[in-house]
């Protein structure tokens, strides 16, 4: 009976340890995914910033050309 008790405690302890390790790995994976999402969001913001900046420059150049043509 004592042998069975010790075996049961050992199995429960090992199960608890493995569960703890799995939960820790799961949290690490979730943190990595959140970090990747944040990096992708930053890249998208930078891309939109560049696109809008270039579009603004192009529009300003066109307006300047139209104004210059009207003055001639």
Curated annotation (Swiss-Prot):
Cell compartment(s), UniProt: Secreted
Superkingdom of this protein's organism: Eukaryota
Propeptide residue intervals: 23-43, 71-72
One GO process term, biological-process aspect: defense response to bacterium
Keywords: Amidation, Amphibian defense peptide, Antibiotic, Antimicrobial, Cleavage on pair of basic residues, Secreted, Signal
Modified residues (Glutamine amide): 69
Tagged with keyword Nucleus: no
Disulfide bond positions: none
Protein task: Possesses a potent antimicrobial activity against Gram-positive and Gram-negative bacteria. Probably acts by disturbing membrane functions with its amphipathic structure.
Name the UniProt record assigns to this protein: Dermaseptin-B6
Organism: Phyllomedusa bicolor
High-level lineage: Eukaryota, Metazoa, Chordata, Craniata, Vertebrata
């Amino acid at each position: 009976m004592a042998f069975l008790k010790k075996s049961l405690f050992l199995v429960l302890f090992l199960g608890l340890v493995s569960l703890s390790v799995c939960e820790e790995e799961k949290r690490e994976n979730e943190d990595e995914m959140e970090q990747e999402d944040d990096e992708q969001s930053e890249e998208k913001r930078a891309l939109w910033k560049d696109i809008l900046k270039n579009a603004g420059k192009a529009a300003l150049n066109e307006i300047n050309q139209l104004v210059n043509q009207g003055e001639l």
